[in-house]
Each structure stands twice: as structure tokens, then as C-alpha cells.
Amino acid sequence: MPIRKVLLANPRGFCAGVVRAVEIVERVLKLFPPPIYVYHEIVHNRHVVEDFTKRNVVFVESLEKVPDGAMCVFSAHGVPPQAHQLSKSKGLRVIDATCPLVTKVHLEAIRFTREGYSLVLIGHPGHEEVVGTMGEAPMQLVSSVEEAETLVVPNPEKVVYLTQTTLSLDDTAQIVRALQRRFPKMQAPPTDDVCYATQNRQNAVREIAHKIDLILVIGSGNSSNSQRLREVSTNTGIPAYLVNNETEIMPEWLDGVEVVGITAGASAPEEYVMRVVDHMRSLGATEIEEYAAEEERIHFALPPQLVQLAKSAVSA
């Protein structure tokens, strides 16, 4: 039986932090001569990175590769304090595109350390966001219930946990419960560290799960929030596949499938969602429905240093 219907999860795709980060690079490209350097991928999406690379943006994994005095943008995932110090010593002109919700976690780490807490960070080892947060203060990283159950901290009577912003809500809740059993007096951050966009996209997938036979998650493999969307669907019992675009969809995935769900990670451009929708139409889908689970109206202002650099460029 051919595909009959496509159900689009909404919200999906770009979050406010990604919109802001991409806009920062776009504006820097207009204001300054190439090349423009970006420390780490500006967002974890192959298409976004490839597009900027074609336009003389150079992505680097080490600030040592950035020439002294060059223009450099820090990625949306945040950086440790050492990156700011090295940039200053190299005379770099820096625009920090760190998502404000990641900055919030950094500031929490600094404050709780000053207040004498033992900090526990729930996150994925090696992720740029985790590296940046852990650079702010002494803390211990846990990524599983098993690690939480055996964790030893300097002051078990005064513990607070923080989280990476792009985690699975379900997995995070399980780890938090394990930590609470081990440290009954543990404090939570004032507001949830898992960001609004991560939560909304995961909730939208849960809401459409009973209406679909399979879900396609548009996003890149190194995108934490995209991987979590795939996991959320799988945990509901619905087959889920993570793809960058329509060319990666395997025909055998769609055998016996009538209703296809589609969502996209927070760094995936809508253009590639529509390309997948068009592909589903070519396979027989005649009904395309938007399922709106939550309306998002959040917008983040551009960083003040970008405004100052723009003024300097005009007066030069």
C-alpha cells in the first residue's frame, strides 16, 4: 500500500538560538571581508556548515588555527573561559554566538560554585556545550543512571545539578531521580536547563506518535537534539530514522507505511523538510497535515558587540 499521508510535527526545525547564531554569521559576512572564522560548527547541521563554507567561512576546531587579529565567531554551543582568554591574547575580533540558554547554564555554574555547592552536570561527554560549561567551574559529569548511582562528590550535603540543554527529557528525568536517591538534599536549577525548543520538539513527536507508522527526523548525526528526537520516537515504539535530506531515505523503510511523520532538529533548515515532503508526494502521499503542538514566539537579540562592530565598520 502506498504512502497516503504526511504528518508534520510542529514546532520543528530552527530554534531561536540557531536563528540568532546563523544571523550573526550572515551579518558578519556582510560587514567584514573574508575569510571569517568560526570556532566549531556554528550549529550542528551539515547543510548550514556547507553553505557557509562556500561563502568563505572557515570552521576551525582550534583557535590556534585562527590568524592573529582575525574576525572569529564562537558557535552557538558555548566555549570555556580559556577560549575567551586565548582570543584576547591573539587580538581576535570576537562575536560570541553562544545561545543565551547555554549562557544561563554557565552563569548558574559560576553562581552555585561561589555558594559552595558540589556541581553535577548531566550531559554527553565531548559535546561542545558540555566542554564549555565544564570550563566554568569544577563539576562532575554524568551521562547515565549507572554513573549517577555510584557518583561521589566533595560535599554530598550540598549538591546541585545542571544539564546540557539538548537532552532527552525522559533520560534526564531518570538520571535526576537516581541522583536524588543518592543525594536526598540535592538542589535543582531555578528553571529547567533543558531548553524550551528541545522540550517542545520532543513533546510534538510524542503527540503524533499514535497517528503515524514511521517518523523521519531531519537533522545531522552530530546534532544532539536531532538524535534525541529519534530516540523519543523509538521509545514510543514507532520506527524512526535520522536523515540529512531526502536522498538518504531508504525505500525499504517505507514498506507497509501509510502515514509518515516528519520532524526536524533545532538546527535543520526548513528547506530540507520541504524536500522530504516533496519526496513523499512523489511516492504517493496526497494529504499533508501540520500538527501544531505548541506555538513558539521566543526571539533572542543579537549580541551588543555585533552592533558595536557594525558601527565601527560604517565609520571606518
Regions found by a protein language model. Name each.
Residues 1-264, 270-316:
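The feature marks the mature, well-folded catalytic cores of soluble enzymes
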